[in-house]
Amino acid sequence: MGMTITEKIIAAHAGRDYVEPGELVTVKVDLAIANDITAPLAIKQLEKYGIDKVHDPNKIALVMDHFFPPKDIMSAQQIKISRDFAKKMGIKNYFEGQDSGVMHTLLPEKGFVVPGDLVIGADSHTCTYGGIGAFSTGVGSTDIAYIWATGETWLRVPESMKFVFYNKPQKWVGGKDFVLTVIGKIGVDGALYKAMEYQGEAIRALDIDNRLTIANMAIEAGGKSGIIEPDEKTVDWVRKRTNREFKLYKSDPDAKYCCEYEFDASKIEPVVACPSLPSNVKPVSEVAGTHIDQVFIGSCTNGRLSDLRIAAAILKSKKVHPEVRCIVIPASDQIYKQALHEGIIEILADAGCLISTSTCGPCLGGHMGILAEGEVCLSTSNRNFVGRMGHPKSQVYLSSPAVAAASAVLGRIAHPDEVAKYEEVETLITL
């Protein structure tokens, strides 16, 4: 029996030739990561047991992104604890402020993750790195502390689900629409502890930004991980960012999947996830006209350069609706600088967008865009649970950057066709 890409990566890191779903294995970890919320908890565990050194400081990365810049005394203290720990342990991969960003955008951008890696993070959206062919998943702070101390962890080998997208997608449709369509189909618990593997010509046609978006939201279906087989696009993208050696893994033709789904990409419309679950997915056409108070374009899901390009292409020479605050947060300093260089920031600012330094910010209801009672936000982030972005009686819809930008102009949920001609902005859109 053959193995899936996920099983092959786990087997390699377990020192095994073969693994199968359900097995408990101990694996070596290539990178163990945490943020300003989860790192202090892990540090506390190490201190509790008198552990005064880490296994390998070069295989640890700490990124201050959730409440950065510090929004209050407590968040400032959390960051200080993390900073002091990094200095004490000789951890050079510590990111705060300058040349930093949102963790799951920053780390692959800087070449810290390559295809075939096994990455564990104290953050649920660690699954993002599957977009470049790594096995990555989230754990709690106690598990991260153990990895920091030993360099390894245990896993139960997950079953794999296969999602095949074929045919050419419609205009305006990209990775966010694909993954929301999947979650709408299987539900928020439809992939519990499963590896969600994406295949097909429509997936291969996507750029890396869109692939990372798809992998990012595996956890919204309960998935252990999301993964896309690396190809020439992946290799080119990674090679521009690191000289690290890596191995490309692919699923065997006779690999076993617990279930398989097929989607005709040509029939998928731009979609939104309605309150208050990522699985409450409907075509934009069914909810067009819904009033909004805020638009958020950013996060580890859709704050990359291609996302800002499409938002700027739609908003160029237009104005954000006067009753809407449109918050745009580039997901890394590098993305911000490139957007500045390309004139994207100027276009967004002229349109009336509020542009922030890189932070998770409003995505988790942390700061810089909190919702009041009764307010409605259309967000390009990944979660829309009750109270996710503010007051329990606020509401959050999820969409692609294209839908978000169009909606910001009209002050209501809108299809991009209502405000822009696809042919005029197509050169800025890479799907």
UniProtKB/Swiss-Prot annotation:
Reaction catalysis annotation: (2R,3S)-3-isopropylmalate = (2S)-2-isopropylmalate
Annotated InterPro entries: Acnase/IPM_dHydase_lsu_aba_1/3, Acoase/IPM_deHydtase_lsu_aba, Aconitase_4Fe-4S_BS, Aconitase_4Fe-4S_dom, HAcnase/IPMdehydase_lsu_prok, Homoacnase/IPMdehydase_lsu, IPM_dehydratase_rel_enz, IPMI_cat
Transmembrane segments: none
BP GO annotations: L-leucine biosynthetic process
Residues binding [4Fe-4S] cluster, per UniProt: 300, 360, 363
Enzyme class label: lyase
Binding note for cofactor: Binds 1 [4Fe-4S] cluster per subunit.
Pathway: Amino-acid biosynthesis; L-leucine biosynthesis; L-leucine from 3-methyl-2-oxobutanoate: step 2/4
Function of the protein: Catalyzes the isomerization between 2-isopropylmalate and 3-isopropylmalate, via the formation of 2-isopropylmaleate.
Summary of subunit composition and partner proteins: Heterodimer of LeuC and LeuD.
Family per similarity comment: Belongs to the aconitase/IPM isomerase family. LeuC type 2 subfamily.
The protein's name in its UniProt record: 3-isopropylmalate dehydratase large subunit
